[in-house]
From Swiss-Prot:
Enzyme Commission code: 2.7.3.3
Post-translational modification: Glycosylated.
InterPro entries: ATP-guanido_PTrfase, ATP-guanido_PTrfase_AS, ATP-guanido_PTrfase_cat, ATP-guanido_PTrfase_N, ATP-guanido_PTrfase_N_sf, Gln_synth/guanido_kin_cat_dom
Temperature dependence: Stable at 30-44 degrees Celsius. Forms aggregates above 44 degrees Celsius.
Domain Phosphagen kinase C-terminal stretches: 119-356
Biological process per Gene Ontology, one example term: phosphocreatine biosynthetic process
Phylogenetic classification of the source organism: Eukaryota, Metazoa, Ecdysozoa, Arthropoda, Crustacea
EC top class, as a word: transferase
Protein name (Swiss-Prot/TrEMBL): Arginine kinase Pro c 2.0101
């Protein structure tokens, strides 16, 4: 049972949400009085309550989603709130649906989408993973952060070949190393106000760190938003090479540390928007002609379930007609399908851009 002080805070938060008529978050849309009353006293085995789930969305009324999972059990215990939000965000992933088993598919189906190097500046594929037996950020103790970092860094130090590299802990990092990682755009900063409000940044920078290979084409973030963010990237448009590198890394790491997986939701992450495959495959791409015809760009993007962002990610402008374009769907399809849909969409965009001469 949640304690009286927590329930009082929840009641206050619920009132604030109800009064916020201009709030458009999915939390506001789906947290009815009856759902609220049925969940407000519940507590997971690790001590997480509904307050941990909704506090970021209560504090930041301009949130798009507004909820996070404090631990794996939260997805089941607070399912009456999570499930409709997941269905709404992951268009059509119904509450009766089951995410398919992991399937990276035939990795040789992926190609260089821009062999002439005229359009695609860089290509990146990332996925998120959580370590089994540990809660997500808000419930982690300082000792657990240290223990996880130890596990992750020793696991990564066993990687070989192209993936071989170095782990840099954020705690006690020298100014030189810090600057080098900033110059490479590898360093992540302490979380934004949405993550801060979700208590995702406690004991910062304890237990946080960055691993990268010598070629700087493979990167792992430890305890940023998720326990692990595994990233494969390089200049140019060779999606095949980027995808194959990611797959071999994930398979290798998985042999050494068990990941949190849910029968219905797939791989578990802190934010429900990343569930399922957890995969985001993206390119930085120059499309000057389509940039001048946003309607056409959006139409093709919608057809292939692509998300179009500005050059520097969410909420930014496209500088010089350069967009960050990625797959939108992460749930209810396999890893292979998610990346294949993105590849097909990018090939189509390049074809249209060429034809618009």
């Amino acid at each position: 049972m949640a304690d009286a002080a927590t329930i009082a805070k929840l009641e206050e938060g619920f009132k604030k949400l109800e009064a916020a008529t201009d709030c458009k978050s999915l939390l506001k849309k789906y947290l009815s009085k009856s759902i609220f009353d049925s969940l407000k006293a519940k507590k997971t085995g690790l001590g997480a309550t509904l307050l941990d789930v909704i506090q970021s969305g209560v504090e930041n009324l301009d949130s798009g989603v507004g909820i996070y999972a404090p631990d794996a059990e939260a997805y089941s215990l607070f399912a009456p709130l999570f499930d409709p939000i997941i269905e709404d965000y992951h268009k059509g992933f119904k509450q009766t649906d089951k995410h398919p088993n992991k399937d990276f598919g035939d990795v040789n189906q992926f190609v260089n989408v821009d062999p002439d190097g005229k359009f695609v500046i860089s290509t990146r594929v990332r996925c998120g993973r959580s370590l089994e037996g540990y809660p997500f950020n808000p419930c982690l103790t300082e000792a657990q952060y240290k223990e996880m970092e130890e596990k992750v860094s020793s696991t990564l130090s066993g990687l070989e070949g192209e993936l071989k590299g170095t782990y840099y802990p954020l705690a006690g990092m020298t100014k030189e190393v810090q600057q080098k990682l900033i110059d490479d755009h590898f360093l992540f900063k302490e979380g934004d106000r949405f993550l801060q409000a979700a208590n995702a940044c406690r004991y910062w920078p304890v237990g946080r760190g960055i691993y990268h290979n010598d070629n700087k084409t493979f990167l792992v973030w430890c305890n940023e938003e998720d326990h692990l963010r595994i990233i494969s990237m390089q200049m140019g448009g060779d999606l095949g090479q980027v995808y194959r590198r990611l797959v071999s890394a994930v398979n290798d790491i998985e042999k050494r540390v068990p990941f949190s997986h849910h029968d219905r939701l797939g791989f578990l992450t802190f934010c429900p928007t990343n569930l399922g495959t957890t995969i985001r495959a993206s390119v930085h791409i120059k499309l000057p002609k389509l940039a001048a015809n946003r309607e056409k760009l959006e139409e093709v993007a919608a057809r292939y379930s692509l998300q179009v962002r500005g050059t520097r990610g969410e909420h930014t402008e496209a500088e010089g007609g350069v967009y960050d374009i990625s797959n939108k769907r992460r749930m209810g399809l396999t890893e292979f399908q998610a990346v294949k849909e993105m590849q097909d969409g990018i090939l189509e965009l390049i074809k249209i851009e060429k034809e618009m001469a």
